[in-house]
A protein has these predicted regions:
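Sec-dependent signal peptide recognition
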Residues: 2-10
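N-terminal cationic leader/targeting segments used for protein routing and processing
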Residues: 3-4, 25, 54, 66-67, ...
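Alpha-helix capping/helix-boundary segments
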Residues: 11-13, 132
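C-terminal motif of bacterial Sec signal peptides marking the signal peptidase cleavage site
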Residues: 16-19
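Bacterial signal peptide processing site
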Residues: 21-23
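Ser/Thr/Gly/Pro-rich low-complexity, disordered linker/stalk segments of secreted
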Residues: 28-109, 117
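Surface-exposed repetitive/solenoidal architectures
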Residues: 102-449
Length: 449
């Protein structure tokens, strides 16, 4: 019996060490991907063989530094894997929030770190300097500012040369009210930081990091520049206005001007000219209205969701997008696939997506494996497609494609007066009290700032 036991132990010993060799090979494979540099967006990325096993983020979180990581088998298709992980990622973000995005009682208090105000609707905290914005970011991100406060700009602010961390993160979303009052924040360069899968980190980058139950209005962002390169297998959400919009009840963003550039490179990217990732769970209501943007997005990675409005849209609630003019130059280079459109990748399991009176113009490139459509780049197939889409007076154009969307037949789609065009037709039916369409190729929104 001892001989048999010894033989079994020897076999196990050999098996374990042979497995360790495989794990070392795995690490080498990941290093090969991480070390790969793409010198030009016009170059085809060098193909790197995917490892047969990959460590999942959820398992990384639960294992200590002294434990051997657990590995799971790699799905046969990288796109299916990425889409599955996108769903898991949203669940992780929701679970990790240490301060639930629910109403809290805000107690008005004078804070001399602002120019004035006590944080109420009638007397908001007044922001007039870069230092005020930095202070606001630190208060929100550390959880030292209760949800429901009111903030307002009192002057134009030049952020050139100022180090700035996005407002709102995975632990503490921005769930308050921000009124730009028509003032402009210019030359902003938000930085993006990583920790363990977003723990206490700003993995969502923009002027705002993660936005929760909030209202943002009358804000102008000019010459925002986000440059970022990171070798990781984490999801990264980047948008000029906000990296991620992730409320539990309601979020409203209206009357905003967004202009800037994004130049980023990492594994899996959700990048939007306005918002990187929009996640609307059950019973959530989202409203985006009267927004004008002009952006340039240069994106490199393994798998990409890129949009002139939003890189990714998960729509399980009631989502409304109206009177939006989004222009974007999108240069993308992915190793596996890209979804590119006004909304890059969309999932609509049971939501109601309403898009009306919108004009989108996209100048982009296309390579083998990319899915490009002017309005909805591609559907995220993991989710069961039984949500509703309503498109009214929507006109969009993108290079390298000929249609607005390619939505599965299971999704009810109601389309009225829409078209694939880079010039607004005379029959666009846009409200001229909101739009100036003197030049139908370059209309603009009449803001009441």
């Amino acid at each position: 019996m001892k001989k048999i036991t010894g033989l079994l132990l020897a076999m196990i010993f050999l098996f374990v060490f042979s497995g360790c060799s495989t794990e070392n090979d795995l690490i080498s494979d990941f290093d090969a991907v991480g070390d790969m540099e793409i010198s030009s967006l016009d170059e085809t990325p060098t193909h790197v063989e995917m490892p047969t096993k990959i460590q999942t983020p959820s398992e990384t979180e639960t294992s200590s530094n002294n434990e051997t990581p657990i590995y799971v088998e790699m799905p046969s298709k990288i796109e299916t894997y990425v889409e599955t992980e996108l769903n898991d990622y949203h669940n992780v973000v929701q679970a990790q929030s240490s301060t639930p995005d629910v109403p809290t009682t805000f107690e008005p208090i004078i804070d001399n770190n602002f120019s004035g105000g006590n944080g109420t609707q009638t007397n908001p905290y007044l922001i007039t300097t870069p230092e005020h914005l930095i202070y606001l970011s630190s208060k929100i991100n550390s959880g030292k500012m209760n949800n429901g406060a009111y903030f307002a700009l009192g002057a134009d602010i030049d952020m050139a040369g100022v180090e700035f961390t996005p407002i709102g993160n995975g632990d503490h979303r921005f769930s308050s009210n921000f009124d730009g009052r028509g003032f402009t924040i210019s030359n902003l360069s938000p930085k993006l930081l990583y920790d363990d899968y977003g723990n206490n980190a700003n993995y969502s980058c923009g002027f705002f990091g993660i936005v929760g139950n909030a209202e943002i209005k009358n804000l102008c962002l000019e010459n925002v520049n986000i440059t970022y390169t990171y070798d990781s297998n984490y999801f990264t959400e980047i948008g000029i206005l906000a990296g991620c919009v992730y409320p539990t009840r309601e979020c409203k963003i209206t009357d905003c001007i967004v202009n800037g550039n994004i130049n980023v490179s990492t594994d899996v990217l959700l990048v939007g000219g306005i918002i990187g990732d929009i996640f609307a769970n059950d019973d959530v209501k989202l409203e985006f209205a009267r927004i004008q943007s002009n952006t340039k997005l240069q994106v490199r990675g393994d798998s990409l969701e890129v949009g002139a409005i939003s890189g990714s849209l998960l729509a399980d609630g009631e989502e409304s997008f109206s009177d939006i003019f989004a222009q974007s130059e999108i240069l993308h280079n992915s190793m596996y696939y890209s979804h590119v459109g006004a909304f890059g990748g969309v999932s609509n399991r049971k939501g109601n997506v309403n898009v009306s009176n919108c004009f989108i113009k996209i100048n982009t490139n296309k390579k083998h494996g990319d899915e490009i459509n002017a309005l909805i780049g591609g559907m995220i197939e993991t989710y069961q497609p039984n949500g509703r889409f309503n498109f009214t007076n929507v006109f969009a154009f993108a290079d390298s494609c000929t249609k607005l969307y390619d939505i599965p037949s299971e999704n009810p789609v109601k389309e009225e007066n829409c078209g694939f065009t880079d010039v607004l037709p005379s029959t666009c039916n846009f409200n001229t009290e909101i739009w100036d369409i003197t030049d139908p190729a370059s209309p603009f929104i009449k803001f009441n700032f």
